[in-house]
């Protein structure tokens, strides 16, 4: 269990103090080419990390201590997976929207996928720029199939480390037992997205000032261990278990002490994803 004091990524709460191989999988691997994403384009793709740590005074939002640890951990993890990582720090709402718009207009035709990581304060459906709220759906909409054609049919992953409300999870004791053909297909514009949230809807998301957020720590660890052999949803299930079992908040404020967290994955992916 973590035993250093933890914070939550909510705007309303002050701080309480080996080589990775990639490519399309052959039939010899037991993975059908028709059921898994083509990942042997010349480039794996972009990984955009928006790391919002310091917020305008008039927002009343606290500094997100520990987020730089998350950003560095993510950078190392996705660079090892051969992604082109771009970190953007302390962006306003307008800057976040402009960044997403500009990136969506790039030519992704030689890229296998796209990843965006959002590290900030949040509420349900909302991520915060340094000066206020941005609708998460608006940020992601730039990469819909009808807007970003060069990513159509390719996996688009959004990883969100932020609160989704103000509920606290006290936990409960439990027994210990038991070349593709997309040109001739019509697909939904919202297809091939995955949203990996650090917490369930309505709940706080925890972050440690020294080690970073629980979710990002677990995500990076599981990717480093399993990205070369497990499908993405299997990896994320292991992330869920690690966060749920191994982490518990420690706070001098009894209202925030001994709390739990469970990540939440929402997938519109249409194929299996192997890095």
Swiss-Prot record:
Signal peptide: none annotated. One of its GO terms (cellular component) is cytoplasm. Its main location: cytoplasm. Inhibited by BIRC6; following inhibition of BIRC6-caspase binding by DIABLO/SMAC, BIRC6 is subjected to caspase cleavage, leading to an increase in active caspases. The lineage of its organism: Eukaryota, Metazoa, Chordata, Craniata, Vertebrata. Keywords: Acetylation, Apoptosis, Cytoplasm, Hydrolase, Phosphoprotein, Protease, S-nitrosylation, Thiol protease, Ubl conjugation, Zymogen. This is Caspase-3. Involved in the activation cascade of caspases responsible for apoptosis execution. At the onset of apoptosis, it proteolytically cleaves poly(ADP-ribose) polymerase PARP1 at a '216-Asp-|-Gly-217' bond. Cleaves and activates sterol regulatory element binding proteins (SREBPs) between the basic helix-loop-helix leucine zipper domain and the membrane attachment domain. Cleaves and activates caspase-6, -7 and -9 (CASP6, CASP7 and CASP9, respectively). Cleaves and inactivates interleukin-18 (IL18). Triggers cell adhesion in sympathetic neurons through RET cleavage. The gene is CASP3. It catalyses: Strict requirement for an Asp residue at positions P1 and P4. It has a preferred cleavage sequence of Asp-Xaa-Xaa-Asp-|- with a hydrophobic amino-acid residue at P2 and a hydrophilic amino-acid residue at P3, although Val or Ala are also accepted at this position. Residues 1-9, 10-28 form a propeptide. The active site is at 121, 163.
């Amino acid at each position: 269990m973590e035993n250093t004091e933890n914070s939550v990524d909510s705007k309303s709460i002050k701080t309480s103090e080996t080589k990775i191989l990639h490519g399309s999988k052959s039939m010899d691997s037991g993975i059908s080419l028709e059921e898994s994403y083509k990942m042997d384009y010349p480039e794996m793709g972009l990984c955009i990390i928006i790391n919002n740590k310091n917020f305008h005074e008039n927002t009343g939002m606290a500094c997100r201590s520990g987020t730089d640890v998350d950003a560095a951990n993510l950078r190392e993890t996705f660079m090892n997976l051969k992604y082109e990582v771009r970190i953007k720090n302390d962006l306003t709402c307008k800057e976040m929207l402009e960044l997403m718009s500009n990136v969506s207009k790039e030519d992704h035709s030689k890229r296998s996928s796209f990843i965006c990581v959002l590290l900030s304060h949040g509420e349900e459906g909302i991520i915060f720029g340094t000066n206020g709220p941005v609708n998460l759906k608006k940020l992601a909409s730039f990469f819909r199939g009808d807007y970003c054609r060069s990513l159509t049919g390719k996996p688009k992953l959004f990883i969100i480390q932020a609160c989704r409300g103000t509920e606290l999870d006290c936990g409960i004791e439990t027994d210990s037992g038991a070349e593709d053909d997309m040109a001739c297909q019509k697909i939904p514009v919202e297809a091939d997205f995955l949203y990996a949230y650090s917490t369930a809807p309505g709940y706080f998301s925890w972050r440690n000032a020294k080690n970073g957020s629980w979710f990002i720590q677990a995500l990076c660890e599981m990717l480093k261990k399993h990205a070369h052999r497990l499908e993405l949803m299997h990896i994320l299930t292991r992330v869920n278990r690690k966060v749920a079992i191994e982490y518990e908040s420690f706070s001098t404020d009894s209202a925030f002490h001994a709390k739990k967290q469970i990540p939440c994955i929402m997938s519109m992916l249409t194929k299996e994803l192997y890095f």
